């Protein structure tokens, strides 16, 4: 039996199939861990979602920002749904859409296997979160997402603010937790996410750190595997194994074997693309950037009273 973690698929069905063939995946005895962002941008999102759904008895999935965006689209009116890009439109118009979206909504924000010694998330963790705290906060949002009020959560999850604080309540709290698990790249030592910085370490504004290198962060008792940050490439440091290697942008799709002491990585070439991947923005002056974030954050700590950002039609917050 082998346990494999796989990076962001993003609707790259053919590439996913090639990777499964290369690792000799046997559903009778192997298990797959998918790091989120199953859909969007790759052109084969419906096929990819159906594939992972068909493997549900032999796999674990954590939700990424693109997956949550798809769920939000699925909860909107038919008129709004028809405005999305063709890749996602095929899902919301599919005959099996309800089965696919209902299953997707039941997936986790964090998966932990203490016997194996691993935690899987999509993006990142707050600097002061232990793995136990992360599990607890993930379960909070999962219960909302899996409950009868999930549509209201999906309408209120958009927005960069507030930053995480243990005292947050209502949808402000849920939004902050979702942003950490699904959008995190850089943050301040206090854990405030910098959503505009998406490039490789060294390009970020002063005072920001990769979430896994923040000074004063807690030591964690599990190894962590994650995706989301394709600009990093394959990165293994500080007990974190980042395996989104940009398959949808012409990079590679990566699998990491988790049930072995040896580092075993298997990759296949990603999608052929005609245009460049998104270019990281030049860093702005830290005083301006962090000052604006603090002022916005101070307005957002009032539980359900904060006005959520208007959700985009089909583009998830990155």
From Swiss-Prot:
Coiled-coil residue windows: none
Encoding gene per record: apaH
Keywords attached to this entry: Hydrolase
Pfam family, one: Metallophos
Catalysed reactions, as listed in the record: P(1),P(4)-bis(5'-adenosyl) tetraphosphate + H2O = 2 ADP + 2 H(+)
Feature: compositional bias, Pro residues: 309-318
Taxonomic source organism: Xanthomonas oryzae pv. oryzae (strain MAFF 311018)
EC numbers: 3.6.1.41
Function field: Hydrolyzes diadenosine 5',5'''-P1,P4-tetraphosphate to yield ADP.
GO terms assigned for molecular function: bis(5'-nucleosyl)-tetraphosphatase (symmetrical) activity
Top-level taxonomy: Bacteria, Pseudomonadati, Pseudomonadota, Gammaproteobacteria, Lysobacterales
Alphabetical list of HAMAP family matching this protein: ApaH
Chain segments carrying region Disordered: 269-318
Compositionally biased spans, kind Basic residues: 282-297
SUPFAM superfamilies: Metallo-dependent phosphatases
Protein name: Bis(5'-nucleosyl)-tetraphosphatase, symmetrical
Family statement drawn from the similarity comment of this UniProt entry: Belongs to the Ap4A hydrolase family.
Record InterPro entries: ApaH, Calcineurin-like_PHP_ApaH, Metallo-depent_PP-like, Ser/Thr-sp_prot-phosphatase
Enzyme superclass (EC): hydrolase
């Amino acid at each position: 039996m082998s346990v494999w973690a796989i990076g962001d698929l993003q609707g790259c069905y053919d590439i996913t199939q090639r990777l499964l063939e290369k690792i000799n995946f046997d559903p009778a005895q192997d298990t797959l861990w998918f790091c989120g962002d199953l859909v969007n941008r790759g052109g084969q999102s419906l096929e990819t979602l159906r594939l992972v759904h068909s493997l549900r008895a032999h796999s674990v999935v954590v939700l990424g920002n693109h997956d949550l965006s798809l769920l939000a689209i699925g909860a909107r009116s038919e008129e709004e749904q028809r405005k999305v890009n063709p890749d996602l439109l095929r899902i919301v118009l599919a005959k099996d859409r309800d089965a696919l979206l209902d299953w997707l909504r039941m997936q986790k924000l964090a998966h932990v296997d203490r016997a194996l010694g691993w935690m899987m998330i999509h993006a990142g963790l707050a600097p002061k979160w232990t793995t136990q705290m992360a599990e607890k906060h993930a379960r909070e949002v999962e219960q909302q997402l899996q409950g009868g009020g999930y549509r209201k959560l999906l309408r209120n999850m958009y927005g960069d603010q507030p930053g995480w604080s243990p005292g947050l309540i209502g949808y402000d709290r849920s939004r902050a937790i979702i942003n950490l698990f699904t959008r995190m790249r850089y943050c301040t030592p206090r854990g405030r996410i910098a959503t505009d910085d998406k490039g490789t370490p060294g390009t970020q504004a002063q005072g920001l750190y990769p979430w896994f290198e923040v000074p004063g962060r807690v030591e964690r008792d599990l190894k962590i595997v994650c995706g989301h940050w394709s600009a990093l490439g394959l990165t293994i440091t500080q007990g974190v194994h980042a395996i989104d290697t940009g398959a949808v942008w012409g990079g590679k799709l990566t699998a990491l074997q988790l049930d072995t002491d040896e580092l075993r990585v298997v990759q296949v070439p990603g999608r052929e693309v005609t245009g460049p991947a998104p270019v990281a923005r030049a860093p702005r002056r830290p005083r301006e950037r962090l000052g604006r974030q603090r002022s916005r954050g101070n307005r957002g700590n009032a539980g359900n009273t904060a006005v959520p950002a208007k959700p985009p039609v089909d583009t998830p917050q990155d």
